[in-house]
C-alpha cells in the first residue's frame, strides 16, 4: 500500500515518501526519481526493520524515538508515550479514557482548548508540557529521518495514510503535526483506498468487473471496505485505451477492536491470576511498572500464538520480587 500512496503524486523534488502511521507503529516508503537509485522501496530503521515503534520518550532531559524509546517502555512506562495518534483532536475526557483503558500512566492535564496535554520529564530542568500534535510531530520527524537516510537526499513531500474513521478534528491535528515536523503533506488518504490502489494498479479490468473486500485489523481498530473495480474506454495520444478505476461502495469499522484489545483481555486474565497467586488483597493493576512488564510479555505470547496452538507465559519479578508463571 505504501508504494501506491507514494505513486499518487509527481513531487517537485527528486523524491516523495509515504507514511503508514498507526497507533502502535509506522512504516515508511520512498519513491526516488534520482537516476541510479531504486525507484520504490521501504525504508528500514536503525534495527534494520521495516516497521518502527511510533513512540516518543523523555528521560533525564533526553528525547528518544522509535526503537530507542521502545527499550525503555517496561522500565519507565510513564515516560514512553504511545497511542499519540489516537489522542489527536480528542476532548480531554475522551483522550484520558483511551489512556486508562490501555493502562498508560501518563501525567496529563487539560489545555485551554479542552484537549489533552502531556507532562514530560524535563530532567534537571522543569517538566515540559506537550500536546498530542507536538508528540506526533516528533514521530513524523523520525519518519522523515528514516526516509532521508534511505534516499540519501532531503525529502519534505509526503502522503500519509489514515484510518477511515478518523474525523475532521483528528485529520486537522495530524496536518498540524506534519507542519510542525516540516512536512509538506500532498494528501491524507484513507488506508483502504491505498490498499485498493495497490491491488488494482497492475490488473486488467477491461473484460471483467470485480468486487473485493479489504479487511484490516490493526493495533487498536478493525475495518472492512467493499470496493468495485472496473474499466472505461479513454484516449491517450489519440489512441483508445482501457483505464482502470475503482469505487469504494461501503466501509465499516470498529475503532475499539484491535490487536491491543486482544492483549488487554489476556492482561486482565493474567492480572487476576497473579493477584490470586500473591493474595493479601494486592492488585497488580495499581502498579504501572508491573503492568508494563505484563503487557510486554503478553504481546510476545500473542505473537507466538500466531503460529502455535499453545505458548507459555512467565514474568520474572512482576511485582515486589514475585515471579509470575
Predicted regions and their residues:
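Bacterial N-terminal signal peptides
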Residues: 1-6
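Oxyanion-binding/catalytic loops of NTP- or PPi-dependent enzymes
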Residues: 8-99, 107-111, 124-129, 133, ...
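Glycine-rich active-site/cofactor-binding loop and its immediate structural neighborhood
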Residues: 115-122
Amino acid at each position: 500500500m505504501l508504494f501506491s500512496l507514494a505513486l499518487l503524486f509527481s513531487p517537485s523534488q527528486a523524491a516523495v515518501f509515504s507514511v503508514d502511521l498507526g497507533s502502535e507503529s509506522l512504516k515508511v516508503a520512498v519513491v526516488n526519481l534520482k537516476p541510479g537509485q531504486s525507484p520504490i522501496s521501504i525504508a528500514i530503521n536503525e534495527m534494520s526493520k521495516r516497521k518502527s515503534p511510533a513512540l516518543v520518550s523523555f528521560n533525564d532531559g533526553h528525547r528518544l524515538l522509535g526503537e530507542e524509546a521502545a527499550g525503555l517502555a517496561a522500565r519507565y512506562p510513564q515516560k514512553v508515550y504511545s497511542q499519540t495518534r489516537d489522542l489527536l483532536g480528542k476532548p480531554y475526557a475522551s483522550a484520558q479514557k483511551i489512556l486508562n483503558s490501555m493502562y498508560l500512566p501518563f501525567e496529563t492535564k487539560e489545555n485551554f482548548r479542552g484537549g489533552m496535554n502531556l507532562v514530560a520529564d524535563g530532567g534537571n530542568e522543569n517538566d515540559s508540557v506537550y500536546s498530542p500534535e507536538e508528540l506526533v510531530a516528533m514521530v513524523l520527524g523520525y519518519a522523515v529521518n528514516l526516509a532521508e537516510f534511505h534516499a540519501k537526499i532531503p525529502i519534505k513531500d509526503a502522503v500519509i495514510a489514515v484510518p477511515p474513521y478518523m474525523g475532521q478534528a483528528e485529520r486537522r491535528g495530524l496536518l498540524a503535526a506534519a507542519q510542525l515536523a516540516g512536512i509538506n503533506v500532498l494528501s491524507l488518504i484513507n488506508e483502504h483506498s491505498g490498499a485498493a490502489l495497490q491491488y488494482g494498479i497492475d490488473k486488467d479490468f477491461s473484460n471483467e468487473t470485480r468486487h473485493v473486500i479489504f479487511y484490516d485489523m490493526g493495533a487498536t481498530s478493525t475495518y472492512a471496505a467493499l470496493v468495485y473495480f472496473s474499466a472505461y474506454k479513454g484516449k491517450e495520444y489519440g489512441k483508445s485505451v482501457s483505464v482502470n478505476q475503482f469505487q469504494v461502495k461501503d466501509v465499516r469499522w470498529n475503532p475499539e477492536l484491535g490487536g491491543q484489545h486482544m492483549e488487554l483481555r489476556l492482561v486482565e486474565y493474567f492480572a487476576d491470576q497473579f493477584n490470586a497467586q500473591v493474595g493479601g488483597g494486592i492488585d497488580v493493576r495499581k502498579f504501572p511498572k508491573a503492568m508494563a512488564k505484563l503487557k510486554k510479555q503478553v504481546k510476545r505470547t500473542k505473537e507466538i500464538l500466531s503460529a502455535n496452538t499453545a505458548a507459555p507465559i512467565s514474568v520474572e519479578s512482576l511485582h515486589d520480587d514475585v515471579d509470575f508463571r
